[in-house]
């Protein structure tokens, strides 16, 4: 699978910004939404890109303006998480999930 195929762009989803996330399950659950205008008040924040069904396609942890880590997600047609492509500390991991009916 070509990793470039996973990367959503602004045209494939809407971006929103958050202070943190909760839980340990994937996809991450971003919490405490903030406005784009307030980003300069935060050293660290999470940028999430969401599709029309509000599924997160991409989650980036931004620290001092630089992307420190990111999660790229793909879903089965029924909305269940299919793949998590995680890039952190220059290490890439893929986690495949079974489709649950």
Predicted regions and their residues:
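Buried hydrophobic residues that stabilize the cores of well-folded domains
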Residues: 1-101
